Regions:
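Outer-membrane beta-barrel transmembrane domain signature
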Residues: 29-50, 79-84, 88-90, 172-271, ...
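Transmembrane beta-barrel domains of Gram-negative outer membranes and organellar outer membranes
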Residues: 29-150
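Transmembrane beta-barrel strands of outer-membrane/channel proteins
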Residues: 73-79, 121-127, 157-165, 221-229, ...
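Outer-membrane beta-barrel "beta-signal"
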Residues: 294-308
Length: 308
């Protein structure tokens, strides 16, 4: 049975029959604990791809040769596009609208370290501060090297990865439990705000080219292309219709992405960069005969300060 909705319904029915027959003897709450390997274009997989792609540790500027021991501190801002109702309807195979529009902007701390032989290590961190019911703890890192750096043209290569997760009441948003289970306002029987966890992990390889104008105060332009492997998991933790839903959804696959932007020097030690990010993301929604492209297109910014 490939349909996740039918599988969960069958599992709930089995639990009900066992519970009614007295297997739930001590009155413990039945637990729905199944694991679903999703196709990469499944609606729920698309939602995970969307937010994982938003967290990719892109160059956000040209790949530069730093002296060994140099340290740059940075603050990155990542805009998150607003999702319409169709895009938010990803739960239960694309039939349940989820509360995905939480934060319009993410912030990430970045530190770049100059290493011997022209390498640079970049570390990024989204600290676990709870904002609008979302608490993310994402650790990312990259190793990069400028393989060509002339007076005007440059080319660099980067290898990056991320581990971490985000927690929020995605499945049962706060307030849904106030309506009777099964009612139009609470059709999926939420009894309390859920405590879901989504794992956003990846590894990627990026090539970044750059161009420097001869004019003073002119920006440095950059263009990047990357291939990414996304490894994602959504752990449901919701009480619905008398059950504790602990369904685990897994998805992994490859994406490509492109970036274009510019970086300005604001002084001897400070730089500001902006970037447009694009990644095509396939999705097959209920009723569709084939996959469509519902891409991620958004803006990023980075303010850097040379500490030493």
């Amino acid at each position: 049975m490939r349909n996740p909705i039918l599988r969960r319904a069958a599992a709930r029915t089995a639990f009900l029959l066992l519970f009614a027959a007295g297997v739930g003897g001590l009155g413990a709450q039945p637990v729905l604990d199944i694991e679903e390997e999703l196709d990469f274009d499944h609606p729920e997989a698309w939602a995970m791809k969307f937010f994982t792609s938003a967290s990719l540790l892109t160059s956000l500027g040209p790949v530069e040769r730093r002296e060994a021991g140099a340290v740059d501190l940075g603050l990155e801002l990542i805009t998150i596009p607003h999702l319409d109702r169709e895009q938010r309807t990803v739960g239960f195979g694309g039939f349940k609208e989820e509360e995905l529009n939480r934060l319009p902007v993410w912030a990430r701390l970045r530190v770049a370290f100059g290493l011997p032989r022209g390498f640079t290590a970049v570390v990024g961190w989204v600290p676990p501060a709870e904002l609008d019911g979302v608490k993310a703890n994402l650790f990312s890192a990259a190793i990069e090297k400028a393989i060509l750096q002339g007076d005007r043209w440059g080319l660099g290569v980067r290898l990056y990865a991320q581990v971490g997760d985000a927690e929020a009441d995605f499945t049962c948003a706060a307030g849904e439990e106030r309506s009777p289970p099964g009612s139009p306002e609470n059709p999926f029987g939420c009894e309390a705000p859920s405590d879901d966890e989504v794992t956003l992990e990846y590894v990627g390889l990026e090539w970044t080219g750059s161009y420097r104008f001869r004019r003073p105060r002119a920006p440095v332009l950059h263009l990047g292309v990357a291939v990414n492997h996304l490894d994602m998991e959504f752990q449901v933790n919701a009480r619905t219709f008398g059950f504790l839903d602990r369904t685990r959804l897994l998805a992994d696959g490859e994406t490509v992405s492109a970036t274009a932007g510019a970086t300005w020097s604001l002084g001897q030690k400070t730089k500001a960069g902006f970037e447009v990010f694009y990644s095509p993301l396939s999705v097959e929604r209920p009723g569709a005969e084939s996959s469509d492209n519902d891409p991620l297109l958004h803006l990023r910014a980075l303010l850097r300060y040379r500490l030493r």
